[in-house]
């Protein structure tokens, strides 16, 4: 049996939710990942260091006995975030980044920034304190085609932003286009990007294969095959600017399977197995460890993990559903076979 032992990975973009939903999904991430950058888009959002401390405590309290996991907290950037809050975040040691959502761009983003140019004083404070800015890189202008929103964001907002704040550490999260890859490659080392398993494995055809498939719908939306190929090449290139971030986003089945369903793919259950399949498809399994375990902590200036996980070449069937409050949770590629399996973690 072929086996692959890796330094224990981290997830640099994760949605854990709260309450009973948190308790349902946290064990899946903790089984594979030592740490995760936890998204702040709760209701209400995590806007202050005090909010982040409370949420962190709830995450740790929900962790099952015998599992270890370190939540790395983030603040939700709003039009009203203050430079003083940025200083408090740096002093806290447990807040590791600030997240930018354009208002209305994705789940629970109603409190997001209405005009990114209004946040320059915050970006200046973040540059001064050396706190990374995490970007949901899409415009929300309804006149812009949904498949072009990332490209237009880069052209309209991101290029000017990094020009104004050249020392600001920036992560362009869940990149989906060749334009995003090109942008990251042509910027300084303080600019990085996360890539999800779904964007490495699927093009937008997956959403419409034989009908509408809501469990492949996420934001930013899956793109053309040429973009998937560009992402796969970037992820497997050995370039440290690209690292793992699942954007695993749990929604109950009835929230996805309806006339106006939520955006988000749930991959925390089997994330490393999905990434292994993607890297194997590019004959690049030797590049998986650095992508999953080294480049993220290096970017965040944190130590690499010392423990390991082992994946084996073993076929198993992804469950149709996993327990979750309400109507259950459908994982990405539910009911299908996958060819890698975590043996310990």
From Swiss-Prot:
Report the active site residues: 247
Quote the record's binding site residues for substrate: 15-17, 41, 136, 219, 251, 263
GO MF terms on file?
A: dihydroorotase activity; zinc ion binding
Cofactor(s) needed, names only, are: Zn(2+)
Question: Which residues are involved in binding Zn(2+) 2?
Answer: 99, 136, 174
Pathway entry: Pyrimidine metabolism; UMP biosynthesis via de novo pathway; (S)-dihydroorotate from bicarbonate: step 3/3
Q: Short name of one Pfam family for this protein?
A: Amidohydro_1
**Which reaction is this enzyme known to catalyze?**
(S)-dihydroorotate + H2O = N-carbamoyl-L-aspartate + H(+)
Q: What is its EC number?
A: 3.5.2.3
Q: What's an example GO cellular component term for this entry?
A: cytosol
Record's keyword terms, sorted = Hydrolase, Metal-binding, Pyrimidine biosynthesis, Zinc
Keyword Lipid metabolism applies: no
Which PROSITE patterns does this entry report, sorted A to Z? Answer: DIHYDROOROTASE_1, DIHYDROOROTASE_2
Q: Name one GO biological process term.
A: 'de novo' UMP biosynthetic process
Database matches in InterPro entries: Amidohydro-rel, DHOdimr, Dihydroorotase_CS, Metal_Hydrolase
Q: Which domain of life is it from?
A: Bacteria
Q: Which residues bind Zn(2+) 1?
A: 13, 15, 99, 247
Top-level enzyme category: hydrolase
**SUPFAM superfamilies membership:** Metallo-dependent hydrolases
Q: Which residues carry this modification: N6-carboxylysine?
A: 99
Concerning PANTHER family, the annotation shows: DIHYDROOROTASE
Q: How does it assemble?
A: Homodimer.
Q: Which NCBIfam families match?
A: pyrC_dimer
Q: Which family does it belong to?
A: Belongs to the metallo-dependent hydrolases superfamily. DHOase family. Class II DHOase subfamily.
The record describes the protein's role as: Catalyzes the reversible cyclization of carbamoyl aspartate to dihydroorotate.
- What protein is this chain from? Dihydroorotase
Q: Organism, per UniProt?
A: Acaryochloris marina (strain MBIC 11017)
Lineage in the entry? Bacteria, Bacillati, Cyanobacteriota, Cyanophyceae, Acaryochloridales
